[in-house]
Amino acid sequence: MTPTKPKVYIVGVGMTKFCKPGSVPGWDYPDMVKEAVTTALDDCKMKYSDIQQATVGYLFGGTCCGQRALYEVGLTGIPIFNVNNACASGSSGLFLGKQIIESGNSDVVLCAGFERMAPGSLENLAAPIDDRALSVDKHISVMSETYGLEPAPMTAQMFGNAAKEHMEKYGSKREHYAKIAYKNHLHSVHNPKSQFTKEFSLDQVINARKIYDFMGLLECSPTSDGAAAAVLVSEKFLEKNPRLKAQAVEIVGLKLGTDEPSVFAENSNIKMIGFDMIQKLAKQLWAETKLTPNDVQVIELHDCFAPNELITYEAIGLCPVGQGHHIVDRNDNTYGGKWVINPSGGLISKGHPIGATGVAQAVELSNQLRGKCGKRQVPNCKVAMQHNIGIGGAGVVGLYRLGFPGAAQSKI
């Protein structure tokens, strides 16, 4: 019989406002991380000296940027792990932090993520160096053999071509993807941390400047500056600090995986963007936690481009394969429907500072479970789900709930 893993909780969260790159003069990544970490520590009324280990996710930057950033908060000699897993860097750091606590090596781990990006499209995610292999060259080969390559941002082509494949195989329409972007921009109106807080009409989404094929600017996540942080603790720590039980969010399950052989073997753009990886992880997550999609009320999902949200509905088990567009038709992805998906505005509207994204999802879900989201609060929020991916590839799916709902209720 497999021994039960120790429980891990999030007790403090914080994030900066996500901003257009360079829009805040003099705002460098150490400043961003300091703001997010300080907010997270204030949230749980802890000190940096309480932190025993830390993970910091980022994509663009040199070695030891995590140290450089956290040194602005304190120098305590703790182990600091820098995590680079493409767009899943932040959630990969959460996965590592959870494992550290489960191992018994630490009771308090800080997980942060940040990005300071250049303006423009998500063009050079793999930071290519001319004299060596590109981390996504095999993924690009799949795309070149199916739809070819065009002079457009590579990531937009990847997800745009996945949408074209879905349209051809399953009958989704251009409007389904526009409706997802419209919905996420509408959600972000009530998120003060969001990069965009403006409502756009469906016509504005459809008629926006085209980035690739049918896909317009408002269906693509922007480049962003920002940071997010979460404080993870063990159950043993909570027993010694019961004041934190009322706000403790249990990480019920968190799965990290990489690409399956089908990514390169089947010449499918849907599989190339990580469908099988996420589907496998989600099945494992549901089985291990003994929860189902019907138990979930809110989901933060990696909508780097609108097509990925629709396709992921199928991968995580919200509906059968090929029926993601029916969720859009039924409005089962927003308030009043079966799930509220991306109440924060998602990557499309909240912003996508790559290393911060996965941690920011956990921040939003923790605040939703704690009932702290104001006008965007999801009613009767009991179980929350996270989905974060990085092409190259890495995928993370997770489930969260209040660890001690009785304690939370007694505090109200």
Curated annotation (Swiss-Prot):
GO terms for cellular component: peroxisome. Expressed in intestine, hypodermis and body-wall muscle. Disulfide bonds: none annotated. PROSITE patterns: THIOLASE_1 (PS00098), THIOLASE_2 (PS00737). GO terms for molecular function: acyltransferase activity; lipid binding; propanoyl-CoA C-acyltransferase activity. A motif (Microbody targeting signal) lies at residues 410-412. GO terms for biological process: acyl-CoA metabolic process; ascaroside biosynthetic process; dauer entry; dauer exit; lipid transport; negative regulation of lipid storage; olfactory learning; pheromone biosynthetic process. Its EC number is 2.3.1.176. It holds the Pfam family Thiolase_N. The keyword Transcription does not apply. Its main location: other. Disruption phenotype: In short-term culture, loss of the capacity to enter the dauer stage which is associated with a loss in the production of the dauer pheromone. In long-term culture, the capacity to induce the dauer stage is restored and is associated with the accumulation of long fatty acid chain ascarosides. Intestinal expression of daf-22 restores the production of the pheromone. Partial dauer phenotype in only half of mutants when the dauer pheromone is added exogenously. It catalyses: choloyl-CoA + propanoyl-CoA = 3alpha,7alpha,12alpha-trihydroxy-24-oxo-5beta-cholestan-26-oyl-CoA + CoA. The keyword Transferase applies. InterPro entries: Thiolase, Thiolase-like, Thiolase_acyl_enz_int_AS, Thiolase_C_2, Thiolase_CS, Thiolase_N. Inhibited by acetyl-CoA. It is found in: Peroxisome. Keywords: Lipid transport, Lipid-binding, Peroxisome, Transferase, Transport. It is an enzyme of class 2 (transferase). Belongs to the thiolase-like superfamily. Thiolase family. Catalyzes the thiolytic cleavage of 3-ketoacyl-CoA with 8-16 carbon residues in the acyl group using a ping-pong mechanism whereby binding to 3-ketooctanoyl-CoA results in the release of acetyl-CoA and the subsequent addition of CoA produces 3-ketohexanohyl-CoA. Involved in the biosynthesis of the dauer pheromone by providing short chains of fatty acid that are attached to the ascarylose sugars of the pheromone. This is Non-specific lipid-transfer protein-like 2.
